[in-house]
């Protein structure tokens, strides 16, 4: 009898344990209302807190749930059932000001987000539903910096976290950046759908000082920049893979910068398509997009070991822009002045690009900071052309302190590629197809030391000298002469 009593006691103790730990937590059980009216922040936060303590997922069922800021905790999974929508409150008072405990560029005006995770581990956001920030409710009221960035909550703000997964969810309409991941490790973003055209500064995603990152199978359309790598702290963004994405942007679809305090290292981007945005009204940039691929170091920092391959760029004004400048902006006021940064070991191949502007692509350093080691191979650029003026004697301004943008120099002296202040460049097996007659050559090299240009083909061109090497360039070997297949 004693043994039977003991067994019963153990069963009574174990049954509630096994029922509670690992059980899912439906937010409606905690009082959340799926009416699209009631602000259910407290109820949803209770479900998150219980999930963190006891295990199990937080379930957002079908329906429209209004919420203010939610704080994710350790070991939390937000799971969205089909037709579930988490809608950001339109009241700024529902987004408390929050700090992260470290300095970064923007820490004096970035305070608020719909979902926040700070210094937590093992968090997941996944499912078949939607998170919608309703960002149009927070209009920009001034052009003055930084005030124009204030009082516009992010959608996701994930800082100093490890083991983060965002999967299969739809993200829409933030008031500011859509998803900011800063100083995170082991980050996986897979299969999400993004449409972000509700406000200014509507980036698709910002990866900032993170390492060990995998981004795959994204279909995204943003008013501002697309997949964006930043370095706004003393942490480098490194060990990153991006693959199999379809991206649209009114600005730069794939972008490194502008903030580059520590820099970027060991990044692979492959098998992606950049296409025109479905949104025709551009709050920022241009409907067709500014640039397909933009690599920028202007606030110090390094950029090294970057491999980009098999990309279709269809529509932006400029397909490719690489820039080493010297804006030298501190990431906070008391930080030391950043030195000139560096760009080295960049490999770009398999680009098929259709430009919508005659500006041309460019790879440019500055006189005191040259790009070192860049390769562009097996690419095809369709260029609009149509410029009749003679630009052979045009002296391009340096503009080393200017905000970096592929359109910053205006019309370039080459219809295909302008290269300046570079040591060791290799251009191999590149086709430039000119749609209209143009007075400019396909390639201009200005202050280049070392490297090779070979197997260049031009289609539709009528100039004999399709490659122009200025007298200040040396050790540059060109073979064979470019072929004109027009």
Model feature map: region roles:
Residues 31, 41, 53-101, 108-111, ...:
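N-terminal extracellular ligand-recognition/capping segment immediately after the signal peptide
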Residues 122, 126-246, 393-398, 439-445, ...:
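Right-handed parallel beta-helix
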Residues 21-43:
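Right-handed parallel beta-helix/beta-solenoid
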Residues 12-20:
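Hydrophobic h-region of N-terminal signal peptides that target proteins for export
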Residues 69, 89-91, 111-112, 134-138, ...:
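Short glycine/acidic-rich loop motifs that flank beta-strands on beta-rich extracellular proteins
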Residues 5-12:
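Sec-dependent signal peptide recognition
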Residues 107, 111-127, 153-165, 185-190, ...:
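Surface-exposed loop/turn motifs in large extracellular/passenger domains
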Residues 477-486:
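Single conserved hydrophobic/aromatic residue that forms the stacking wall/gate
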């Amino acid at each position: 009898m004693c043994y039977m009593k003991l067994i019963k006691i153990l069963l009574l103790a174990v049954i509630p344990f096994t029922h509670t730990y690992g059980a899912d937590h439906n937010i409606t059980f905690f009082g959340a209302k799926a009416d699209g009216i009631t602000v259910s922040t407290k109820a949803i936060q209770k479900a998150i807190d219980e999930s963190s303590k006891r295990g199990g997922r937080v379930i957002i069922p079908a329906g429209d749930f209004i919420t203010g800021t939610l704080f994710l905790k350790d070991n939390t999974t937000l799971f969205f059932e089909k037709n579930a929508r988490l809608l950001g409150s339109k009241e700024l008072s529902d987004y408390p000001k929050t700090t992260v405990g470290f300095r970064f560029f923007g820490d004096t005006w970035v305070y608020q987000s719909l979902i926040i995770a700070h210094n937590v581990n093992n968090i997941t956001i996944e499912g078949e539903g939607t998170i919608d920030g309703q960002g149009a409710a927070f209009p920009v009221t001034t052009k003055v910096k930084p005030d124009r960035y204030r009082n516009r909550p992010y959608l996701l703000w994930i800082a100093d976290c490890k083991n983060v997964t965002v999967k299969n969810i739809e993200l829409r309409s933030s008031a500011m950046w859509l998803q900011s991941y800063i100083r995170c490790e082991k980050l996986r973003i897979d299969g999400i759908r993004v449409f972000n055209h509700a406000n200014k500064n509507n980036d698709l995603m910002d990866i900032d000082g993170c390492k060990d990152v995998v981004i795959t199978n994204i279909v995204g359309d943003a008013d501002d920049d697309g997949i964006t790598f930043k370095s706004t702290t003393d942490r480098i963004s490194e060990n990153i893979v991006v693959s199999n994405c379809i991206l649209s942007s009114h600005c730069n679809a794939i972008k490194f910068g502008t903030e580059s305090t520590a820099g970027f290292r060991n990044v692979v981007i492959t098998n992606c398509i950049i296409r025109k945005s479905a949104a025709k009204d551009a709050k920022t940039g241009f409907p067709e997009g500014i640039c397909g691929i933009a690599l920028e170091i202007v606030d110090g920092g390094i950029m090294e070991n970057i491999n980009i391959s098999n990309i279709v760029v269809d529509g932006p004004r400029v397909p490719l822009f690489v820039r080493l400048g010297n804006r030298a902006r501190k990431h906070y006021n008391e930080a030391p002045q950043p030195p000139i940064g560096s760009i080295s070991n960049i490999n770009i191949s398999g680009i098929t690009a259709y430009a919508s502007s005659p500006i041309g692509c460019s790879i440019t350093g500055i006189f005191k900071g040259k790009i070192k080691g860049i390769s562009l191979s097996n690419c095809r650029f369709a260029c609009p052309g149509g410029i009749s003026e003679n630009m052979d004697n045009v002296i391009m301004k340096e503009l080393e302190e200017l905000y970096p943008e592929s359109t910053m120099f205006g019309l370039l002296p080459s219809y295909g590629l302008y290269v300046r202040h570079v040591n060791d460049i290799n251009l191999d097996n590149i086709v430039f197809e000119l749609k209209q007659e143009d007075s400019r050559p396909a390639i201009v090299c200005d202050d280049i030391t070392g490297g090779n240009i070979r197997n260049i083909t031009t289609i539709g061109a009528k100039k004999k000298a399709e490659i122009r090497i200025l007298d200040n360039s040396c050790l540059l070997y060109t073979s064979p002469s470019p072929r004109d297949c027009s």
